[in-house]
Amino acid sequence: MKIIRLLALLLLLATLLTSCVISVGDSSVLNFLSVQDGSVVVHARSGPDATITAAGDLTIDGKPVATTTEQQALLKQYYDQALAIRAEGVATGVAAASLAHKAVSNVATGLAHGNSDSIGPRIEAEAKTVKAQAMKVCDAVAELRKTQDALVASLPAFKPYALIDANQAADCLSK
């Protein structure tokens, strides 16, 4: 019975990870957000992509968008937060993979030695650490949403790229 609870906990952690972060490298950060060649690329539901550089420069469909100093600062903040989500996602993925490896190893060892009762508490304690790491991703998504909303209020051209809604940020935090 405890092994079933453990496996359910691991599935919950996997769900947490996949609901927020997709992959790494020159890669996706969220479903609509990726990092390519050192820039953050925001994919609109329809229409051209927007690219944000580390300096806070914005291009839409490859064309520079004129911005004020305040807007550029918000774009730089958006860029930094997107990279933070990716970094937190990588750290969470590594921790979850390590936990999964330990869980499988501990289950096999525990079953082989008839000591399955001690497996659950050890893995559950480590799973709390992974869940806390995953919550950092969710917190970062919520912060990115705030920056996104400030950008939309300040820079109407960014509106098609405001794809994080209140439910998405809240759903991640509630898991």
Model regions and ranges:
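Terminal leader/tail segments of proteins
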Residues: 4-5, 20-175
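Sec-dependent bacterial lipoprotein signal peptides
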Residues: 1-19
